[in-house]
């Protein structure tokens, strides 16, 4: 497990909440925070030198560049694009500027190819293609020295020998960026699988407006970890057309990427409550009192 941080959005206690939820669900990690391992450090702020060195390496190889555009200029650019009804994206103003030695605030952007296509195989969706002209020169390293998700996930996954990347489908459109970073660095990319989103009853993306969204809030409401684990595992995945109740060991034994669906999964509180009640009725009085 590697903890990635966005300094501007850090919430006090968030890390402890995440780790606490994983521990409550018995989702133990082989290595990472609190455990250690051979691929540390496991906190992004302790890995900054890795991202910075790799970003500078890409600049030296003319695969990335310093961007000196101010936030004010970028705001005006976006407003102009909106007025002209143009798709949003960086206009590559700094792409061919010489790199200066002066200490001018800057970010590092990746030189994404303008022509052609970028394709990759998704284990759930098959071959996916993107026209390169739809992807802008994205920021890899911010002015404060912190990486964006695009750079951090490629560097961490490569250095930690990650073979499979399973993440929400909202990251599908970012995958061409990651594929090109892998290519630029000479890394072999992992296998990708983009999971369907969890939806509310109105079929929109699950959010706070749909009610409780924190795992630990459900714990505090009396839901059992076994029921929550079982319920979450069946959001977008199924063993067959009828099996609903499965123990953690059964879910682990039978899980396969091939049975993950493409459509979004509805978060049904009624089903979770039914499943929780079933697990409670199977427990002894002594187990319930623990």
Question: Model segments located where?
Answer:
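Alpha-helix initiation and N-capping motif
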Residues: 15, 48, 52, 71-74, ...
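Catalytic adenosine-cofactor/nucleotide-binding cores of aminoacyl-tRNA synthetases and other
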Residues: 8, 173, 185-290
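Short glycine-enriched loop/turn motifs at secondary-structure junctions
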Residues: 35-38, 160, 212
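N-terminal Rossmann-like or analogous alpha/beta NTP/dinucleotide-binding catalytic cores
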Residues: 1-83, 173-187, 227
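Active-site cores that bind ATP or allylic diphosphates and position pyrophosphate for catalysis
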Residues: 57-60, 64-194, 199-206, 214, ...
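A generic structural motif
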Residues: 5-6, 159, 166, 279
């Amino acid at each position: 497990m590697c903890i990635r941080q966005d300094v501007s959005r850090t919430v006090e206690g968030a890390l402890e909440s995440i780790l606490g939820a994983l521990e409550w669900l018995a989702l133990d990690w082989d290595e990472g925070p609190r455990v250690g391992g051979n691929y540390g450090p496991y906190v992004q702020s302790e890995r900054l030198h890795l991202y910075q060195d790799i970003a500078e390496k890409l600049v030296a190889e003319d695969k990335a560049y310093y961007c000196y555009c101010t936030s004010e200029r970028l705001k005006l650019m976006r407003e102009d694009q909106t007025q002209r009804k143009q798709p949003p994206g960086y206009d590559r103003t700094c792409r061919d500027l010489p790199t200066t030695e002066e200490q001018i605030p800057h970010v590092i952007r990746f030189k994404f190819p303008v022509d052609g296509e970028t394709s990759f195989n998704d284990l759930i969706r098959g071959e996916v293609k993107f026209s390169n002209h739809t992807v802008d020169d994205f920021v890899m390293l911010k002015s404060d020295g912190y990486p964006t998700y695009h750079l951090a996930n490629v560097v961490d996954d490569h250095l930690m020998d990650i073979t499979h990347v399973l993440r929400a489908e909202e990251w599908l459109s970012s995958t061409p960026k990651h594929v090109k970073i892998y290519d630029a660095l000479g890394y072999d990319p992992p296998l990708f699988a983009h999971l369907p989103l969890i939806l509310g009853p109105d079929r929109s993306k699950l959010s706070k407006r749909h009610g409780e969204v924190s795992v630990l809030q459900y714990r505090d409401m009396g839901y059992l970890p076994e029921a929550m684990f079982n319920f979450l595992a069946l959001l977008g995945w199924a063993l067959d057309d009828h099996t609903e109740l499965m123990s953690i060991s059964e879910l682990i034994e039978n899980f396969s990427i091939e049975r993950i669906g493409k459509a979004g999964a509805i978060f049904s509180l009624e089903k979770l409550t039914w499943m929780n009640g079933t697990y409670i009725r199977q427990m002894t009085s002594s187990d319930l009192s623990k």
